[in-house]
């Protein structure tokens, strides 16, 4: 049956009993479940209960329910499931309950609060918080008075929010993911960062997305630099596993050779002339392994007030597991910046700020939405595991053609600092939990649909 939302409370006059509204009456109900915790109990019905479900105090605690809340009730296979219980997986914990995730504490508090307001239970955890023998986790929950630790069951579904690739590659974290997925059949979404080159290859092979892609090659060489710089006004060399616009080089052919612009990790901008590709590559190799980089065709982007502009488009799966476009923003290059990243001095504008003409604005929305949804479907078809959100960087050239530069499985959220984009910030977060609810329900009612043999 479809889940329905109820207030979850405690009955202090009974023992080991789950009280349901009469509207949910079914024969043969034997168990109550919360997350992966299942307890045999007596199920009774009360006519006066309409939007409330009550549990005997001992049953409430045995199921490890952390507090009264609003949650979905899903009845399947003689069991009443309360939830969903969503675990947000991360790393980088501190001992402080005031700021348990350092600078990310505010982000996680908003995420947990948003989910619990919508219905269900949500906590943050890491590999070290799992008690494998007991099948429990010491999770961090955010309540009115701040962060608190509670022992909860293993969750119905995991939303991966590891902060970076280096941490993701930890053997402990890889083992933790594998064990929860393989042994406990817990759906885990956005479980890896995308590799730029792997994504490019997947999209390039599919006729639905190949037309969006600028020419890209792995491992810049003298021959490739000469060829691409001869064919295009600008060429970019970027890390295959980069983030936030770091480590990117812009190459332009000149009468005297090459001009190379770069913003380093310290955000210092440089522009250096080289006599030829060989001299640049020799200097480049002193600091980098070329096989970790790709070389990409530059695109003559549309401009806003004389500065190049591109677009961040977010897609999320919804409560039905369907892709939706949740946010579109314009990113405008900063002074002396070779990218539009905010970390390199770029600025964010809404579409309405850039396109005065409503008809033109609608046309841009249609173009970008169609491209983003198509790319989302293709990546879903070809990448193993569950994907619930993607952040795309698109460009539109001077001729109106759409180009796709990047896809990120854990997109940055700096665009949402714009005051007119706060509402879509909440929407993208809400969609992630809608998809978590979808995965949780499917894992309970039809696991074969999630993990076909």
From Swiss-Prot:
Keywords: Membrane, Sporulation. GO terms for biological process: sporulation resulting in formation of a cellular spore. GO terms for cellular component: endospore-forming forespore; membrane. InterPro entries: YheC/D. It is found in: Forespore outer membrane; Spore coat. SUPFAM superfamilies: Glutathione synthetase ATP-binding domain-like. Signal peptide: none annotated. It is a peripheral membrane protein. Belongs to the YheC/YheD family. This is Endospore coat-associated protein YheD. It comes from Bacillus subtilis (strain 168).
């Amino acid at each position: 049956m479809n889940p329905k939302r109820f207030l979850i409370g405690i009955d202090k006059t009974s023992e080991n009993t789950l009280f349901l509204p009469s509207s949910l009456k079914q024969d043969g109900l034997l168990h109550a479940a919360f997350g992966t915790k299942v307890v045999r109990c007596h199920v009774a019905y009360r006519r006066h209960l309409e939007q409330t479900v009550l549990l005997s105090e001992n049953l409430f605690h045995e199921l490890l329910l952390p507090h009264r809340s609003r949650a979905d009730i899903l009845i399947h296979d003689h069991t009443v499931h309360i939830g969903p219980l969503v675990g947000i997986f991360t790393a980088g914990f501190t001992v402080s309950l005031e700021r348990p995730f350092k600078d990310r504490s505010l982000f996680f508090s908003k995420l947990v609060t948003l989910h619990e307001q919508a219905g269900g239970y949500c906590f943050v955890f890491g590999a070290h918080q799992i008690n494998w023998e007991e099948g429990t986790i010491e999770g961090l929950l955010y309540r009115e008075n701040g962060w608190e630790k509670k022992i909860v069951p293993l969750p119905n579904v995991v939303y991966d929010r590891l902060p970076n690739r280096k941490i993701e590659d930890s053997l402990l974290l890889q083992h933790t993911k594998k064990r929860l997925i393989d042994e406990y059949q817990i759906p885990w979404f956005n479980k890896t960062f995308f590799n730029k080159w792997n994504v490019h290859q997947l999209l390039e092979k599919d006729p639905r997305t190949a037309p969006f892609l600028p020419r890209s090659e792995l491992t810049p060489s003298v021959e490739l630099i000469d060829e691409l710089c001869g064919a295009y006004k600008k060429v970019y060399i970027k890390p295959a596993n980069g983030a936030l616009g770091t480590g990117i080089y812009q190459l332009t052919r000149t009468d005297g050779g090459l001009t190379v612009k770069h913003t380093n990790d310290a955000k210092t901008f440089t522009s250096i002339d080289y006599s030829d590709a060989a001299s640049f590559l020799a200097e480049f190799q002193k600091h980098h392994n070329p096989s970790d980089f790709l070389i990409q065709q530059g695109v003559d982007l549309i401009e806003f007030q004389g500065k190049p502009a591109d677009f961040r488009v977010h897609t999320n799966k919804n409560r039905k597991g369907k892709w939706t476009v949740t946010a579109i923003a314009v990113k405008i290059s900063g002074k002396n910046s070779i990218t539009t990243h905010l970390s390199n001095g770029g600025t964010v504008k809404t579409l309405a700020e850039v396109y005065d003409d409503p008809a033109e604005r609608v046309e841009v929305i249609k173009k970008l939405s169609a491209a983003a949804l198509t790319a989302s479907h293709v990546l879903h078809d070809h990448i193993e595991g569950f994907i619930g959100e993607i952040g795309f960087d698109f460009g539109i050239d001077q001729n109106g053609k759409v180009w796709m530069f990047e896809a990120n499985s854990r997109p940055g959220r700096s665009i949402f600092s714009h005051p007119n984009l706060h509402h879509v910030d909440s929407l993208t977060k809400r969609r992630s939990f809608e998809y978590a609810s979808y995965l949780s329900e499917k894992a309970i009612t039809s696991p074969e649909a999630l993990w076909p043999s």
